[in-house]
Amino acid sequence: MASLYSQGFELYPTPLHMENYILETMHSNVLYFLVEKYGKIVSLASAEMDPKNRNAEITDCLTIPSERGKGHMKELIRALEKELSERSFLTFYTLCRASAPGINAAFSSLGYAFTGRLVNNCRIGNGFEDMNIWCRML
């Protein structure tokens, strides 16, 4: 997972390129789900959980270029939502790159409401990027 994240994101707000970081978060408040094809990870996403307030951020979404447009991310988001709802979570949200139409389309098609844009909010890749906020309540 760390290797795929390091290939997919040149810069990222959290150290997903470090295996120890991923393992540490797995044992705290983060769920990681993935799609494999022929024994290789082709898509992955996570949910950072806030159990006290029963909300979770769907984040760290990545699909390798050759597998984009095949519905993997929507499958992962649905699976994360199912797991979270079984744990009594009521609200899901995400901040995703405004410049990435695929991930925005995925959240929109799954019934998330666009609630705004944070301008120059997150340092990913070559600089600061605008981030769209999407929310869904059960």
Residue map of PLM features:
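A conserved beta-strand-loop-helix scaffold within acyl/acetyltransferase catalytic domains
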Residues: 6-65
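Short hydrophobic/aromatic beta-strand or adjacent loop that forms the aromatic wall/cage
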Residues: 30, 129-133
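Conserved catalytic-core motifs of GNAT/GCN5-like acyltransferases
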Residues: 93, 113-128
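Short beta-strand-to-coil "C-cap" segments at the C-terminal boundary of structured domains/repeats
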Residues: 135-138
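Conserved beta-strand-loop-alpha-helix junction that forms the acyl-donor binding cleft
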Residues: 94-104, 121-122
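Conserved GNAT acetyl-CoA-binding A-motif
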Residues: 84-97
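Conserved acetyl-CoA-binding loop-helix of GNAT-fold acetyltransferases
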Residues: 63, 69-84, 105, 109
